[in-house]
From Swiss-Prot:
Descriptive protein name: Phosphoglycerate kinase
Pfam families (UniProt xref): PGK
Record-listed E.C. numbers: 2.7.2.3
Residues binding substrate: 22-24, 38, 61-64, 120, 153
Gene that encodes it: pgk
GO molecular function, one term: ADP binding
HAMAP family from the UniProt entry: Phosphoglyc_kinase
Main location: cytoplasm
Keywords: ATP-binding, Cytoplasm, Glycolysis, Kinase, Nucleotide-binding, Transferase
Classification via InterPro entries: Phosphoglycerate_kinase, Phosphoglycerate_kinase_CS, Phosphoglycerate_kinase_N, Phosphoglycerate_kinase_sf
Lineage: Bacteria, Pseudomonadati, Campylobacterota, Epsilonproteobacteria, Campylobacterales
Keyword Nucleus: no
């Protein structure tokens, strides 16, 4: 971890600091924030800057606006929530690099906070545009990246902006350091037995991570929609369940590689099946060998939960990424929720990655019991895959 430039090593005294945060929070149709975990996660870095007499400019994206300003993607609500959490004013700019932002930034005094409007209202943000990055860099003498959730994206406020700062004036915030730490320790020195639990709908999104995890884990549990491609590769009849036909050979290859490495791989033994994904559809609990034709598995069944619980019993480290079923609908969420309970009961070091998985853990009431809940899905997967992330690379110390 010492190879990453850290905020605690910088001389911040009374400087203006630009912090790239990840305030990409879920909202309901009335634009109320339904989960403010990402906002709360940014507070230690913000407070540290304020304690050093800094003035602070915060920048983030929210959602994926198509072209320019859209009310539902405004960060105004985030500024209000942050103000409440910090118990101090957060000044809000109605644009990103326009006159409102510039005027408010130049009037900023020590101890004051300004939040810019959604970075993605500027089309240059996602294009990693250096002109936009240069404009953003004018907002701070110091650049801090605390947005792990976007570190796998080469965007203007994440990568291009770092070119405007030398090593004395840029660093990772506390949240980013914590994220990198957990991911690196997981890969390099997990306490064993190390069990990876991988779910979610698609094998394609997790293929590289599975290949990278196999030599490092002791056991691998595969659930969610992606399990059906593995079951199909073993010759099971999976009915209408989700299948990535073109990845059957890859699935077979992973199972074979697991066997060669002595890694035990566990797949669901039963499922909750329905004819369609709807609240009205009748459901059946069936073994994976007996999914009726025209029916699809939408969650793991009770026997799978029992099996996976036994597999986890002696775990010392658990990494979980991806739900066990289509948890958005109550009747198909039980497997994921029971999995969450089972992981918490292990008393192992438990690391949860990915937005959906974090939602499951929150819903199960287990969030406080997990060792660490990562704020980034794609980013944590890419770190596990062993990739260098565009947002982290410029924050590595030059000498190493």
């Amino acid at each position: 971890m010492s190879d990453i430039l850290s905020i605690s090593e910088l001389n911040l005294a009374k400087k203006r600091v630009f912090i790239r945060c990840d305030f990409n929070v879920p909202m309901d149709e009335f634009l109320n924030i339904t989960d403010d975990r990402r906002i709360r996660s940014a507070i230690p870095t913000i407070r540290y800057c304020l304690d050093n007499g800094c003035s602070v400019v915060l920048a983030s994206h929210l959602g994926r606006p198509k072209s320019g300003f859209e009310e539902k993607f405004s960060l105004k609500g985030v500024a209000k929530r942050l103000s409440r959490l910090l118990d101090r004013d957060v000044i809000f700019a109605n644009d990103v690099i326009g006159s409102d932002a510039q005027n408010k930034a130049s009037a900023l005094k020590s101890g004051e906070i300004l939040m810019l409007e959604n970075l993605r209202f500027e089309k240059g943000e996602t294009k990693n545009d250096e002109i936009l990055a240069g404009e953003l860099a004018k907002f701070g003498e110091i650049y801090i990246n605390d947005a792990f959730g976007v570190c796998h994206r080469a965007h203007a406020s994440v990568e291009a902006i770092t070119k405007f700062y030398d090593d004395e004036h840029k660093a990772a915030g506390f949240l980013l350091q914590k994220e990198i730490n957990f991911a690196q320790n997981l890969i390099k020195k997990p306490t064993r037995p190390f069990v990876a639990v991988v779910g979610g709908s698609k094998v394609s999104g997790k293929l590289q991570a599975l290949h990278n995890l196999l030599p490092r884990v002791d056991k691998l549990i595969i659930g969610g929609g992606m399990a059906f491609t593995f079951l199909k590769s073993l010759g099971e009849n999976i009915g209408n369940s989700l299948l990535e036909e073109e990845l059957i050979d890859d699935a077979r290859e992973i199972l074979k590689k697991g066997k060669e490495l002595g890694v035990k791989i566990y797949l669901p033994v039963d499922v909750v099946a329905a004819q369609s994904f709807s609240a009205e559809s009748a459901v059946k609990y069936v073994t994976v060998q007996e999914i009726p034709s025209g029916w699809m598995g939408l969650d793991i069944g009770p026997a799978s939960v029992r099996l996976f619980k036994e597999v986890l019993a002696d775990a010392q480290t658990v990494w979980w990424n991806g739900p066990m079923g289509v948890f958005e609908m109550d009747k198909f969420s039980k497997g994921s929720i029971k999995m969450s309970h089972a992981i918490v009961e292990t008393h192992a070091t438990t690391v949860v990655g990915g937005g959906d998985t974090a939602d499951v853990v929150e819903r199960a009431g287990d969030a406080d019991e997990m060792t660490f809940i990562s704020t980034g899905g794609g980013a944590s997967l890419e770190l596990i895959e062993g990739k260098e992330l565009p947002g982290i690379k410029p924050l590595r110390k030059a000498s190493e």
